């Protein structure tokens, strides 16, 4: 097959790209080429900015070598305008178009619901989820062989799955290793379904040019589920540390960490369980579930610990967590150590760790300036 992957260097698309290559396909990936660590050297890289380059320029780059593709997989569309532009550029020059949506688009009726593809969609509690739903609605009106894929929380060697975690995910591991408290939502009791990217890739691959997948939507998830607290406990065991949490309820989360409020009340702070019968029927067997949670998390931890370029610390997040831990559970902590810590990192930490003090200092300085 000639396969075009829009993306190809993210956590979800990297293992899928590898799977397609390992199966002997010709794989093109379109991305900006910035994350060279995660771009497989076997791919035919189309270096382009899908959001900002003119459509005619992008079309010329995409179809420079071949006039059409068997399958195009879109990991990059997050809002309907993205999808509309992408399909305009592609101009129907493919057999199957696969849109990577999200299982967060489901609009759950209750915490005990086992989600199927017939469950209601349109989760209005989180903008990301609702926009994925809007993308799906747009795609369903298109006269193409589309397939909608709804992954849930996926993880792999370069992603640590956790509900409250910054973009620089090593920060979480660093806090655990430093015996600092980790912020959890409602004791970490919410049930999560975590899917390793290798297992996701195997199932998705079997939907390529599968006529049972045309004009259909599927979620692809693991068959096991566990509370988030168990995920944290395993991480602590892998790092040879004892668990130490600071739990926030819903009101405290909205007050102290509003940037995480939507994703928690609309997704990761709720129970998420799935029935994979539909996709299993389409591929003729059960979904792949070959990587255990412990083995998958060990793979992630080892990758972060063995690659210095992954060991970035978000000192704003570190300071924010220490402020909350001191405020809520009276646990006092110091800034994380790092051989590459900069002066501005220390400043960021202290601004977040001592917000009231910094506010008063700034107010005092402003008053002095006004008096001059």
Language model features: what each stretch is:
Residues 164-172, 185-208, 215-216:
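Substrate-positioning beta->alpha
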Residues 113-136, 153, 162-170, 193-194, ...:
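Short-chain dehydrogenase/reductase
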Residues 206-264, 276, 299, 310, ...:
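Mid/C-terminal beta-alpha module of Rossmann-like enzyme folds, strongest
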Residues 67-114, 119, 123, 130-141:
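NAD(P)-cofactor binding segment of oxidoreductase domains
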Residues 30-34:
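N-terminal Rossmann-fold cofactor-binding loop
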Residues 136-161:
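Conserved beta-loop-beta element that borders a ligand/cofactor-binding pocket
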Residues 3-23:
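N-terminal Rossmann NAD(P)H-binding glycine-rich loop of SDR-like oxidoreductase domains
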């Amino acid at each position: 097959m000639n396969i075009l992957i829009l993306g190809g260097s993210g956590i979800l698309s990297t293992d899928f790209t590898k799977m397609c290559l390992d199966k002997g396909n010709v794989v093109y990936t379109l991305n900006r080429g910035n994350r060279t660590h995660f771009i497989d050297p076997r791919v035919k890289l189309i270096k382009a900015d899908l959001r900002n380059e003119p459509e005619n320029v992008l079309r010329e780059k995409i179809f420079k070598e071949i006039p059409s593709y068997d399958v195009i997989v879109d990991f990059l569309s997050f809002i309907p305008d993205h999808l509309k532009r992408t399909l305009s550029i592609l101009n129907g020059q493919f057999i199957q178009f696969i849109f990577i949506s999200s299982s967060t688009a489901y609009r759950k009726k209750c915490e005990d619901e086992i989600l199927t593809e017939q469950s209601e969609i349109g989760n209005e509690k989180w903008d990301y989820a609702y926009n994925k739903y809007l993308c799906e609605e747009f795609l369903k009106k298109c006269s193409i062989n589309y397939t909608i894929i709804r992954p849930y929380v996926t993880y792999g060697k370069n992603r640590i799955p956790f509900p409250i975690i910054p973009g620089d995910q090593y920060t979480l591991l660093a806090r655990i290793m430093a015996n600092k408290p980790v912020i959890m939502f409602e004791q970490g009791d919410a049930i999560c379904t975590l899917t390793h990217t290798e297992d996701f890739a195997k199932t998705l691959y079997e939907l390529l040019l599968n006529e049972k997948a045309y004009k259909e939507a599927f979620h692809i998830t693991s068959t096991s589920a566990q509370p988030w607290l168990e995920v944290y406990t395993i991480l602590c065991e892998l790092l040879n540390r004892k668990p130490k949490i600071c739990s926030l309820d819903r009101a405290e989360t909205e007050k102290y960490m509003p940037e995480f409020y939507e994703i928690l009340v609309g997704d990761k702070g709720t129970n998420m369980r799935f029935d994979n019968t539909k996709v299993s029927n389409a591929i003729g067997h059960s979904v792949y579930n070959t990587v255990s949670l412990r083995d998958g998390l060990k793979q992630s931890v080892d990758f972060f610990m063995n690659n210095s370029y992954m060991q970035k610390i978000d000192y704003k997040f570190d300071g924010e967590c220490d402020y909350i831990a001191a405020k809520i559970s009276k646990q006092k902590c110091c800034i994380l150590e790092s051989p590459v810590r900069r002066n501005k990192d220390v400043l960021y930490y202290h601004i977040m760790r001592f917000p009231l003090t910094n506010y008063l200092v700034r107010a005092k300085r402003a008053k002095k300036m006004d008096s001059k």
